[in-house]
Amino acid sequence: MHRIAAFLYGIVCYAIFFATFLYAIGFIGNVIVPTSIDGIPTLPFGQALLIDLALLAVFAVQHSVMARPGFKTLWTKIVPEHVERSTYVLFSSLALILLFWQWQPLGGAIWQINNTLGRNVLYGLCAFGWLLVLASTFLINHFDLFGLRQVWLYLRGRDYEHPHFVTPSLYKLVRHPLYVGFIFAFWATPDMTATHLVFAVMTTVYILLAIQFEERDLIHYHGDAYRNYKRQVPMLIPRLLSRKNSVQQAAAVNDSV
């Protein structure tokens, strides 16, 4: 693939991702976008539930399988290595677009907060979650995570190197602040419907499973540095009572890399 074409492809894939990310905020929050998680049910409950579970499964399988090193080894025999990450980002975006398009509301209220202060607090926590997701990507390497660094290096004729293992700020408190952000974004709502609950439960289960695969790959890439980090820093819930020690331990791991 021509270097300029590869670079433009990476930019297009990133633009599709970012538009999808913004749509996801509206979809989960039931604001602005034409289709959202809590529309008016049009199908019987059982049929709608099966469709929603299938859509979530499509995303989970795509997102996890395409991220595994074994799949990448086979995939890069077809797709050039420098656009592999951009292609992964594109496929993930398409899986989410399919979910947004075909999602079937279930109806039914689990909880509803009518107090203005309570609603605003939950909206604030949801917004905090989305900001935490985005901030967490920039703390490590946003542009590598979404394929832009790879196509930029290819455009410049430079070899790609996997990013070094670092534990900046939030990563000294928990190993996966990005996933913490998603959990806040998915669960913090003043109007929890059956539809939203299914989405929140299933995505949380997926996050807990995905972490196991992701950390196995991180150990493969970073070896003892990540093993030590995993022993010393909690996965999702910070040790608030021993925050100082956790920060010092993570800093020690970072210095040893």
Q: Where are the regions a protein language model picked out?
A:
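Core segments of transmembrane alpha-helices
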Residues: 91-98, 103, 126-129, 172-185
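Juxtamembrane/interfacial segments flanking transmembrane helices
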Residues: 65-73, 103-111, 137-153, 214
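Membrane-interface helix termini and inter-helical loops of multi-pass transporters
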Residues: 30-42, 72-76, 104-116
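Juxtamembrane helix-capping/reentrant segments at transmembrane boundaries
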Residues: 39-47, 74-91, 156-160
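Alpha-helical transmembrane segments
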Residues: 43-57, 118-137
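Hydrophobic transmembrane alpha-helices
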Residues: 19, 23-26, 46, 55, ...
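Alpha-helical transmembrane segments of multi-pass membrane proteins
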Residues: 14-34
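Alpha-helical transmembrane segments and their helix-start/interface "positive-inside/aromatic belt" motifs
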Residues: 2-14, 85
